[in-house]
């Protein structure tokens, strides 16, 4: 069943805004500056805008969320950003997540406006539209699909994948079931995006990532709080405070990097990779060679470490471990398909092998026990060594 849907229909320039809390509201100038920024950042027209001030300091600094609302119809998607603003004289300078100025301004902001934990996380952000040749060549994930995230519910529970990748760039999946408690996929700082303080929450993580959770009921509201992986965020629900529609209680889980929505396909969440189908809401997920379709059960294995891999024998059963980086070395046991392995280092000059999706490589990974397996049969999220060369 289709779940959250949001798309756009009106012009930003003529729409109202909301500023909260009232105590911070000396700000037609601030709200106007943020609203103008929404107009340039939004990728589609909106049904309204919100400028939600979370923290301010003597009307010189402000931090909050900016939202381009969606109409309450199917297949509609709101957009939202965290922002920081600084006033010099009568002029406000506003930066959104993903702007080059965002980590700079958040670093300069007083502690009462942007906390030290927030500054540390925001320092990892880089512009979504990279200007340098290096970043332009490798935008966003840049061929590295590691997230360090778990699925957004308790480890050991199984929830249903009720909607495959969907959204503007297929950045979202829908999940339902279990005990209904939605938990942080990774440690970070917590924010509620809508002025209602309901429904849509965001956790900003390290490495430029953030995760969004929509339709929540009974969500926490402590904006700026530091959350650990697995901390409670809210319950599955049908809230549409920022627009769109929902049928049946679920969480609409989305992935972002450097302030941009990014396709969730191929990224690892809870030791599963989700892949696109021929249409939105379709697709499937893989854990090693185990495949589930829409409506299938996703067991939460927990996060995959950044120097770990998942054995994917491409349907071939247990994988033979070798005493060195090649098939010509002695066999020293096997490792099960779907097993998590810890990688000590890698060698790029082993024998060549071809794994899933035609991935061919001569790289072999040395495991923590000293044995070796081909990277062709190890999902790590990148074709490069994850723990250096041997």
Task: List each language-model region with its residue ranges.
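Short, non-transmembrane alpha-helical segments in secretory-pathway proteins
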Residues: 26-51
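Zn2+-dependent peptidoglycan hydrolase active-site motif and core
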Residues: 184-220, 241, 245-250, 351-364
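A structural signal for short beta-strand/turn segments enriched in small hydrophobics and glycine
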Residues: 161, 188-190, 224-239, 338
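Secretory targeting and sorting signals
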Residues: 1-26
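Short beta-strand edge/turn micro-motifs at domain boundaries
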Residues: 81-137
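Acidic, glycine-rich catalytic/binding loops that coordinate metals and/or anionic ligands
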Residues: 146-149, 181, 247-308, 375-390
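SH3/SH3-like beta-barrel superfamily modules
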Residues: 76, 334-382
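Surface-exposed, glycine-biased beta-strand/turn segments
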Residues: 113-199, 229, 284-317, 323
């Amino acid at each position: 069943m289709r779940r959250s849907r949001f798309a756009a229909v009106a012009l930003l320039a003529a729409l109202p805004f909301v500023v909260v809390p009232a105590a911070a509201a000396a700000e037609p100038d601030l709200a106007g500056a943020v609203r103008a920024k929404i107009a340039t950042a939004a990728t589609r027209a909106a049904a309204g805008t919100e400028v939600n001030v979370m923290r301010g300091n003597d009307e010189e600094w402000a931090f909050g969320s900016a939202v381009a609302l969606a109409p309450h119809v199917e297949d509609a998607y709101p957009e939202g950003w965290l922002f920081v603003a600084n006033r010099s004289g009568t002029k406000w300078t506003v930066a959104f997540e993903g702007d080059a100025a965002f980590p700079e301004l958040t670093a300069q902001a007083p502690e009462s406006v942007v906390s030290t934990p927030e500054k540390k996380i925001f320092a990892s952000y880089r512009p979504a539209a990279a200007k340098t040749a290096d970043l332009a060549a490798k935008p966003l994930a840049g061929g590295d699909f590691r997230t360090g995230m778990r699925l957004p519910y308790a480890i050991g529970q199984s929830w249903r994948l009720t909607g495959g990748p969907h959204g503007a760039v297929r950045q979202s999946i829908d999940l339902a079931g279990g005990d209904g408690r939605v938990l942080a996929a990774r440690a970070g700082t917590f924010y509620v995006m809508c002025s209602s303080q309901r429904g849509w929450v965001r956790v900003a993580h390290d490495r430029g990532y953030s995760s969004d959770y929509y339709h929540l009921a009974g969500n926490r509201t402590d904006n700026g709080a530091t959350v650990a992986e697995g901390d409670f965020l809210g319950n599955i629900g049908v809230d549409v405070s920022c627009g769109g529609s929902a049928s049946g209680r679920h969480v609409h889980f989305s992935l972002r990097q450097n302030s941009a929505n990014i396709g969730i396909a191929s990224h690892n969440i809870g030791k599963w990779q989700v892949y696109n189908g021929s249409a939105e809401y379709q697709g499937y997920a893989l854990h090693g060679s185990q495949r589930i379709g829409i409506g299938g059960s996703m067991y939460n294995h927990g996060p995959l470490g950044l120097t770990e891999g998942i054995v994917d024998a491409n349907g071939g059963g247990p994988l033979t471990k070798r005493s060195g980086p090649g098939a010509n070395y002695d066999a020293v046991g096997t490792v099960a398909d779907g097993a998590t392995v810890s990688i000590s280092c890698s060698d790029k000059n082993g024998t060549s092998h071809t794994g899933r999706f035609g991935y061919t490589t001569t790289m072999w990974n040395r495991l923590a026990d000293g044995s070796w397996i081909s990277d062709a049969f190890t999902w790590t999220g990148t074709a490069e060594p994850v723990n250096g060369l041997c």
